[in-house]
């Protein structure tokens, strides 16, 4: 009898129980959008983020973790473990006819969902996808069993004009798809994430949940009661708040006191130089940003509570990070547009002034490969998998979003495939972060690399080489100068030469070249915006001062001539009358030093017609791009200036259109503070054949 009992005990110990809780961990990857390095409390911020701070206190904070500097490339790298160009998403979601710039996840990559499914995982995603849904790369065909997603974001409330959500591949407005009548996207992504987790539990499967918040990306929107709580909290201004964040970071051990706080950008004014009205405006826009952050933190708290209530928290690895640095895209002044800023119809950006606070203590912003553009928090939380002695500590080893796939595979006991659906797969580029959970060294054998919009960087150990587009390389010793204040390139030419050679070799093997491929002409014949008819078909646009059009609403001017007629009353010598596009393609009609300028930006080069006489007071102006690409300016019926471009625009500009300002990528040779000084009675644009 005793022998039988002993045998039974041995057999019970060897049986694999149907519950997944005994072995494979769950994995939750949380990506937020346009959040700076210092915005959350556990990285020095004053914005209330108690739930994230609790994860950091009981988990591990990485102080040298990186993204790719931009939305789409980071998502591609995070999901595939490849550099974004290798996955086909070297820039945004337009197909440029080049392997590294196809605008969609390619078939030489696998997502972490596709890699974890063979290991028995239930896979789900909620939130912002933005890796080529417009070109056919969709979550339900890239390994996710369940999904509730936005193709590219751009909204928070259900009544936003841009709100479009897909549930398991079916648009939410379609028959049979039911969402709450009223929702806020941050909460919606979390609610459905928990629903999908319940499906996994019912199937007794471990789960992967990829939760991609669109917060705090523009247009910044939040419930009014959330915004009201933050009004007046930022009137100390970016200078004092930035200094306070920096001191908290030093005290926390995130920042070495040897690294000086980077200087305020030259075009950002001192807070104390602003009028009370200007300070009120800036406080308002940052209150909206803080409200989106607070709501996002609360939703993460709801997710953690939901995992705890379901008995899943102990064996769930949670990874939290941002897709790029804080965003200065709207220029120095930011945007606070709409009758009720922060509601579904409004358009709010924090702008460059507050982005300097977001990215404390670093220089530059989203788009750039300086630390301000690529440094992100990474919080790792896993009660069962992170050593108790490590909890609450800071990990200084460098990491990159290419490491997320390797980490997921490692903790799940899954293998990275050599081929998928009959296609050879590009070898994994990242390394697992799991050794850091136990205080061990990462097994990294290669430097880390970056390229975005020709901004380049490589980090090998503590040495970082970085360059702006078309600018010389700069060298920094990050051990003593993480804030990139002292360029050593002139004193260490051999080190520069070695790092440049490493970057060149990486670029050649990783589909980065040709450099500038992101500006290549958009490929025809694919299911892109032009092929799908998503660009405006209108040929006449009647506009007024303050009007803003999204890209899809703007005049379709690629390969075509067009005419602008504007009635203005100029009271100041500078300012934009109308602009469409940005630094690669577009046009702008503006005053500069009293002269009227009509500029065409074609493939990054600027071609202009400029009047010799000053323009003051009331005038009717006509600016024209003829079919032979001659630029002409007519003032009150008289030809005033001409110019010549080598041809029409090669592709539709990425940025939309604005009347009276240019707050996106700057088309003309003017600064970010370019609001028109005077009145604009009307602007009419007519597009030719």
List the model feature ranges, each with a label.
Residues 1-7:
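Bacterial N-terminal signal peptides that target proteins for export
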Residues 2, 21-469, 473, 482-501, ...:
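Formylglycine-dependent sulfatase
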Residues 468-470, 478, 601, 636:
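Surface loops and adjacent helix of pleckstrin homology
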Residues 508-511:
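Acidic/polar, glycine-enriched structural segments that form the non-catalytic walls/loops
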Residues 523-689:
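Extracellular glycan-associated modules
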Residues 380-381, 459, 477, 567, ...:
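Short, well-ordered beta-strand micro-motif
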Residues 11-13:
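Repetitive helical segments and hydrophobic/amphipathic motifs
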Residues 16-18:
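N-terminal signal peptide c-region/cleavage motif recognized by signal peptidases
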């Amino acid at each position: 009898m005793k022998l039988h009992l002993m045998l039974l005990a041995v057999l019970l110990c060897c049986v694999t129980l149907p519950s997944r809780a005994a072995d494979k961990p769950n994995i939750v990857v949380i990506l937020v959008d346009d959040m700076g390095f210092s915005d959350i409390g556990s990285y020095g911020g004053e914005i209330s983020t108690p739930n994230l701070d609790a994860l950091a206190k009981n988990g591990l904070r990485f102080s040298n973790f990186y993204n790719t500097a931009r939305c789409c490339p980071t998502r591609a790298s995070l999901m595939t473990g490849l550099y974004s160009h290798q996955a086909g998403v070297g820039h945004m979601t337009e197909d440029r006819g080049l392997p590294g710039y196809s605008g969609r996840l390619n078939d030489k990559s696998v997502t972490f969902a596709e890699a974890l499914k063979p290991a028995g995982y239930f896979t789900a995603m909620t939130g912002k996808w933005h890796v080529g849904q417009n070109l056919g790369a969709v979550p339900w065909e890239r390994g996710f069993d369940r999904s509730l997603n936005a193709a590219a974001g751009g909204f928070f409330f259900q009544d936003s004009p841009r709100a479009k959500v897909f549930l398991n591949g079916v648009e939410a407005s379609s028959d049979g798809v039911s969402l709450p009548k009223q929702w806020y996207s941050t909460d919606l992504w979390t609610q459905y994430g928990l629903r999908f987790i319940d499906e996994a539990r019912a199937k007794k499967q471990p789960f992967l949940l990829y939760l991609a918040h669109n917060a705090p990306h523009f247009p910044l929107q939040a419930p009014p009661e959330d915004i009201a709580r933050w009004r007046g909290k930022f009137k100390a201004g970016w200078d004092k708040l930035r200094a306070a964040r920096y001191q908290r970071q030093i005290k926390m051990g995130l920042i070495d006191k040897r690294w000086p706080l980077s200087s305020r950008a030259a075009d950002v004014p001192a807070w104390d130089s602003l009028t009370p009205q200007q300070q009120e405006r800036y406080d308002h826009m940052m209150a909206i940003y803080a409200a989106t952050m607070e709501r996002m933190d609360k939703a993460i708290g709801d997710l953690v509570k939901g995992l705890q209530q379901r008995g899943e928290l102990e064996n769930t690895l949670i990874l939290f990070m941002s897709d790029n640095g804080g965003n200065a895209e709207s220029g120095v002044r930011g945007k606070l547009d709409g009758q009720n800023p922060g509601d579904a119809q409004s358009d709010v950006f924090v702008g460059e002034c507050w982005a300097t606070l977001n990215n404390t203590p670093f220089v530059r912003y989203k788009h750039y490969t300086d630390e301000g553009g690529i440094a992100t928090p990474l919080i790792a939380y896993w009660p069962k998998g992170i050593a108790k002695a490590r909890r609450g500590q800071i990990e200084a080893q460098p990491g990159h979003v290419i490491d997320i796939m390797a980490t997921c595979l490692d903790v799940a006991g899954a293998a990275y495939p050599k081929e998928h659906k009959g296609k050879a797969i590009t070898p994994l580029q990242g390394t697992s972060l799991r050794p850091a959970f136990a205080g061990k060294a990462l097994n990294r054998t290669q430097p880390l690399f970056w390229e975005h919009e020709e901004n380049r960087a490589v980090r090998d150990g503590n040495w970082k080489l970085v360059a702006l587009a078309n600018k010389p390389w700069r060298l920094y010793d990050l051990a003593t100068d993480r804030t990139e204040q002292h360029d050593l390139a002139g004193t260490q030419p051999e080190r520069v030469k070695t790092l440049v050679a490493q970057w060149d070799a990486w670029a050649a093997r990783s589909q980065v070249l040709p450099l500038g491929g992101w500006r290549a002409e958009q490929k025809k014949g694919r299911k892109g915006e032009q092929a799908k008819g998503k660009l405006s078909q209108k040929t006449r646009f009647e506009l007024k001062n303050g009007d803003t059009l999204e890209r899809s609403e703007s005049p379709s001017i690629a390969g075509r001539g067009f005419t602008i007629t504007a009635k203005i009353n100029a009271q100041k010598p500078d300012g934009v009358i109308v602009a469409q596009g940005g630094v690669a393609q577009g046009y702008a009609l503006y005053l500069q030093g009293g002269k009227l300028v009509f500029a065409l930006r074609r493939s990054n080069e600027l071609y202009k017609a400029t009047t010799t006489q000053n323009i003051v007071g009331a005038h009717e102006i006509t600016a024209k791009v003829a079919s032979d690409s001659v630029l002409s300016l007519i003032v009150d019926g008289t030809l005033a200036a001409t110019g010549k471009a080598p041809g029409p625009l090669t592709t539709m500009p990425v940025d939309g259109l604005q009347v009276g300002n240019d707050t996106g990528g700057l088309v003309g040779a003017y600064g970010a503070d370019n609001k028109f000084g005077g009145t604009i009675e009307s602007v009419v644009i007519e597009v030719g054949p």
